[in-house]
């Protein structure tokens, strides 16, 4: 594969945007979720236990411990961290000089600090994925402080960037595997998508239309999902460029389709950012028009022969993937029904045996791929000119290669969770290494949509309030389904964490969601910050004048409406049926409610509020008051619009800064030096015929210096 400079720059740029979305989205929800009188107050997670300050920092690494020293309570410290994180990530998004290792270290520390007190509202896989990706960015990003006066493309950059590809492999492969290891009948029956669109956490309007697609197409979509998540990731580590590009576009296609049909915050965008690890500079430069090549006969004869040989290997590999997909999912065209029929043609035992067989070979394949990147880095270090620079490059290569090997090693523990027999065969030292760093969320296990919920109807909790216990009024949420006539919302990349947890709460008894009792308690109190999570516009909240005397919750089953046989569109988006009472009617000082709150310490008296007269609390309050009326999706979409407007104006007026190719200190082989002697026109022609495999680095740099 070719160089990764532009791909790495795209990865760091995209991750900066993801951090911005994550910090801003969480910031607007802090008072209601984690405030002194929020649903799950964060101050409860930072109680001093008699241990020393640094010992508590070690047990729960978080910058929030420094809040009291700044005169801030826990809530305001969280707001400060979110604002600093948003400002820093916005700067990294707009200015390439800020896409530095130290900047990404700060962003990672900021998000980890929030994660430590986030409790159930931050325990999502994409939060763990962002932390792991963010830590890898510290290794991937350039450290300008160590590069002094020149921007040197370090020999180790390919090694550290490889870790993002390994993370993407683990994410996608595990997401496909767990769907089958869970024994979920909808995944095995290929009918999961006939339920998915209406049962996902927060559907959008496109989900309603996707739900109307014919069953045979839904089943084929499940087969395609398995193909992309289980089969295609094996191509990530093969030395064939076109197969990797195919992998890139297939993964991106899947993520875009999920974005179109669902509200999954920044998760799919983050996955697309990880897909940059499969790109090379030649492919990115093609779209940026860095290369205007006109290949002429004679010069490309040997390259053509090499491409032909590579194609002879690529075609059978791709053909095998298609063949196995057709065979094991029994794909057949039904000409009479004009459809494509499919079924699972293997058993759970067959799949478990296959998984057990390939788990360790997949590790060795990945290890060989990493080893190849390390060897390439060693060769580049040896090619650096000058004894001092060669020594410096070698030391960096050695340090980052060891770091990459360590990250790869500890990631094997969560990776092998999908097959516990393989997990048990790992060396005890590997488990010990993982347990040592587990608190920092450096590596995690993944596996999305393990089981398809909502078979037989989407469970939904509807909260109701009353003044007299006779007349009940439903409390509508901004994002989750409630009123059957309300159109589903589009809120990407925002994640309304209360609405998401309401979806999880509906899947089981209320006792499995202790936070729900606290939520009801705050509504009975008329807590403005918690109400703001339910309705940003208080006038739409039915009890904005006076809090309700009683609150209860009912459980319903929801289904998408369908187009009738005549093709007429229904008037409502949903239909629903009452199932049972989810939470009994309670009031303030109700013994049942008090008992639930006391069991989980949710009625403890908060610490005294700190003064707002100090400069930092005063500024934080001003910012909060200014942003409070804005809905979170509007705020995030404004950021997106503003950023792209800036880039558009820069492009229009010629001020856009493209990712540059760093100057090299690598010496050229003798045959390369001979090719530099002809005139400049010939030199440019030669450099334009880059094969994308890193053989013409110096010539490409010469061309960039001229332009």
From Swiss-Prot:
Membrane topology: Multi-pass membrane protein
Natural source organism: Xenopus laevis
InterPro entries the record matches: LMF
Keywords per UniProt: Endoplasmic reticulum, Glycoprotein, Membrane, Transmembrane, Transmembrane helix
Segments crossing the lipid bilayer: 10-30, 78-98, 102-122, 126-146, 158-178, 220-240, 256-276, 309-329, 358-378, 395-415, 634-654
Cell compartments where the protein resides: Endoplasmic reticulum membrane
Recorded GO CC terms: endoplasmic reticulum membrane
The family this protein is said to belong to: Belongs to the lipase maturation factor family.
Record's compositionally biased regions (Low complexity): 680-694
Ranges annotated as biased composition (Basic and acidic residues): 696-707
Source superkingdom: Eukaryota
Chain positions covered by the region annotation Disordered: 661-707
Name of the molecule in the record: Lipase maturation factor 2
Keyword Glycoprotein: yes
Pfam families membership: LMF1 (PF06762), LMF1_C (PF25179)
One GO term of the biological process aspect: protein maturation
